[in-house]
């Protein structure tokens, strides 16, 4: 009887233990993998960058640059096409009269002009950017270069009334114009390549622009020796660009009155030498020298060098980057030079 009771107790205890164990068993949840989206690299805003402006684009950038000799005589103003130029070079021709070399690659103006005659140093600048060079007439030195095929070119002397058109509103030699359509037409007729972009300049990124150093300067005046050909630039804070003036008159498009606005103003000095009785010059674009670079309302002293035919601002031998946008380059005699012929004015002065 006692054995029976012991066995019964053991059976009851076993049942109780088994029951408790079943209650204590907790089934752990099976982890479910969540679909976490992978972070993708941010796509660039544009796929290309224009080599002469540093401006982004999704269009082709392979078009060849075109350099046009633009008349800057008082009787030739206001001009056509300057607002579309990527780069404009301004320097003396004869006497105290300046002339402009307008370079186009990212934009094509409907019409450019008035067109003026070639000079050898402008040809050198155009050659450095592998441009098709457009002029109407030439100096003896320039004529020699053109006839020898030094640069692909269109000369209005041979296309007056065909590719080049005369405006009835002005008198010669201040009335020769050419459309961009006719530039391309003439280039194709002569078998010139219309593709082949120039090498790119160095441009600053957004962070580098924020860290720009230099003295605050809102206005600059450049003296070429005669008031009618003196040039001024004024920084427009709201637009973040420079407005250009000739003897106090703002530079605008002839037909639309759209003002010329630029992002970089580079002023350099170099040796000038008068070579004939007419007052033509030899201008040294090889040796380098001193300069001022104006960007975003600030100015800094730089040096310039000729790098593969291009005028490039440097500091301690390193390229000084340009603000993406348009650039105007003023080249002045080094006698008396920057300190005498360039006036820098700070805000409020």
Name every feature range the model reports, one short phrase each.
Residues 16-19:
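C-terminal motif of bacterial Sec signal peptides marking the signal peptidase cleavage site
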Residues 9-10:
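Small-residue packing motifs within transmembrane alpha-helices
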Residues 22:
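Short, conserved catalytic or interaction motifs in soluble domains
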Residues 1-6:
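Positively charged n-region of N-terminal signal peptides that target proteins for export
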Residues 26-63, 67-85, 94-349:
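A surface/extracellular/periplasmic glyco- and lipid-processing/surface-interacting theme
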